[in-house]
């Protein structure tokens, strides 16, 4: 993987380097196809978002500091579902990273009502598909002022459906 490529020429050079490295590693591997994606701008913060079935308590939403901070800060809150947008909003405000979302040191603020609404929609999707999806974890969820982007996600489905 290569990051920070800013021109067509730098992308072409990266493709050559990676293709050559793959061919040296294993000549039998197909090294003719590449996935090239736009690099995302740095977010205001990163969240971990998890919705899973608990055998004892039912469906639960866990929110916390995401990305590399997930284990470092041990900053999580769990809500039993169903939870309202207001409850999700209140839970977000209890996180250590809430100050970042509130414009810490003059930085851009996150639209917390919009973020809460988006997270609520995720919980609604999960609650309406419990027989198909057992667990969803997004880490990190990039949080910008007016939008979010799931950078990496893991979905456990029910193999029987």
Spans of features found by a protein language model:
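ATP-dependent carboxylate/acyl-activation modules
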Residues: 1-161
